[in-house]
């Protein structure tokens, strides 16, 4: 069963933890790709200098951040990569969760072809470990791009999160990645991951 709007309508920090162990589903050419969410980061616009919406900043690019909980915010970085976020809390609050890493579960050959243009069996150990172990890596592997920006995960048939109950794990809380510019916010312990999971991007 997919997650509902009520599930997403909470503080980004709480949602980031509760998404761990849930399963992201992405349909590509009629085939459902599935991956367990193993690493997330929370962003809270009002108080977070790492957020694209810090201090109420509102632009065409960041407008999805102000949308309903459960909306996808997909943004472009470094001129070639995408990052996928899910909006939380309430409309207008500019809170969201970055999905940082997935553990591939179903249709791994297609995931591998999208990521490396190779069958999974052809990948070396480094490639297998890095197939979805980072926000842009998982976007490539699950074909998530600007077309998914604003997509409603509560209604979409091609991008949503399943309420699968994987809960036999310990959650590590630590600093976020790549936000040294964010002054005191760089020290917020708002990154969460499943302890000892091989697909976590940074431990």
UniProtKB/Swiss-Prot annotation:
One of its GO terms (biological process) is base-excision repair. Its EC number is 3.2.2.-. Gene3D superfamilies: Methylpurine-DNA glycosylase (MPG) (3.10.300.10). Keywords: DNA damage, DNA repair, Hydrolase. InterPro entries: Formyl_transferase-like_C_sf, MPG, MPG_sf. Coiled coil: none annotated. The keyword Phosphoprotein does not apply. Pfam families: Pur_DNA_glyco (PF02245). It comes from the Bacteria. SUPFAM superfamilies: FMT C-terminal domain-like. GO terms for molecular function: alkylbase DNA N-glycosylase activity; DNA binding. It is an enzyme of class 3 (hydrolase). Transmembrane segments: none annotated. NCBIfam families: 3mg, PRK00802.1-1. Belongs to the DNA glycosylase MPG family. This is Putative 3-methyladenine DNA glycosylase. It comes from Clostridium botulinum (strain Langeland / NCTC 10281 / Type F). The lineage of its organism: Bacteria, Bacillati, Bacillota, Clostridia, Eubacteriales.
């Amino acid at each position: 069963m997919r997650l509902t709007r009520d599930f997403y309508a909470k503080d980004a920090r709480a949602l980031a933890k509760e998404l761990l162990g849930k399963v992201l589903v992405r349909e590509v050419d009629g085939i459902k790709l599935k991956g367990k969410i193993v690493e997330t980061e929370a962003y809270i616009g009002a108080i977070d200098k790492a957020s694209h919406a810090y201090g109420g900043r509102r632009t065409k690019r960041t407008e999805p951040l102000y949308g309903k909980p459960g909306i996808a915010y997909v943004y472009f970085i470094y001129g070639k990569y995408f990052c996928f976020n899910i909006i939380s809390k309430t409309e207008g609050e500019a809170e969201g969760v970055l999905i940082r890493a997935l553990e591939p579960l179903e249709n791994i050959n297609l995931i591998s072809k999208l990521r490396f243009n190779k069958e999974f069996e052809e990948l070396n150990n480094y490639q297998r470990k890095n197939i979805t172990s980072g926000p842009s890596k998982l976007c490539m592997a699950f074909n998530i791009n600007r077309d998914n920006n604003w997509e409603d995960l509560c209604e979409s048939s091609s991008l949503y999160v399943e309420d699968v109950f994987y809960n036999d794990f310990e959650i590590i809380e630590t600093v976020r990645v790549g936000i040294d510019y964010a002054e005191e916010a760089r020290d917020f312990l708002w990154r969460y991951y499943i302890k000892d999971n091989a697909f976590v991007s940074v431990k």
